[in-house]
């Protein structure tokens, strides 16, 4: 009887061991599949476009689509995570990459850093491009992003191809554009604006005329007290909008209730960081005593979150 019992126990143990082994094998397979996709995502999470970029974007999405829901949750790499393909950022079909040919002789190239959030891209970047097109009916408006990482993300996830700077300028040359205006959507004369200008300089001789517009805040100025009409316009519009959205009749009314408005920038180590201090000077010049300019990364120091608070 004991022997029979032992055989039954052994069989039960063997079955449990077999199931455990199968479970471990399945888990390992899931992890390997997820790691493969993570590697493919990390391969396109780069700032340089190569001859293999289009192929890599396609491969990454196809591999993601083959994963089970459980496997997708395991995707994790240096930059890869489940949100890269899995997060819903809106309907990409509502966007217009503005990468068409048939440009004509006059082109306005709107250059943005870019965003992979579809709803934001449609409302903000496309909104600016559409407004520029409406105001300049005799000019063709095209788009370029400076962030290849974002271009790759949108292409891989949504199959929407957006030109980088070189692609957009080469397209302009190929289409026989004579007069080119480059309109950045950048905030100020930072590193992105410098790189933009350097890229345009390489193509300067390909056109009869090339003009690069100022960023939103205009020229930088020599010190923190120097302001300009661009900064004034931005300060007035931002403050008016913020006061209205906060439900106050005026900035003074908000002040009486002890309410302050803080406009946050990213912050930068670039020499253009003085622009943040200049915007604070502009707010002060306008008499906006309860309006402050802050920076997330704390450069310049006088606009760091701690200083503002």
Task: Label every model-predicted segment.
Residues 79, 83-309:
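Active-site-proximal alpha-helix that buttresses catalytic centers in soluble enzyme cores
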Residues 2-3:
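C-terminal motif of bacterial Sec signal peptides marking the signal peptidase cleavage site
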Residues 6:
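Short, conserved catalytic or interaction motifs in soluble domains
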Residues 12-32:
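Post-signal peptide N-terminal segment of mature Sec-exported envelope proteins
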Residues 25-88:
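Beta-rich interaction/scaffold domains
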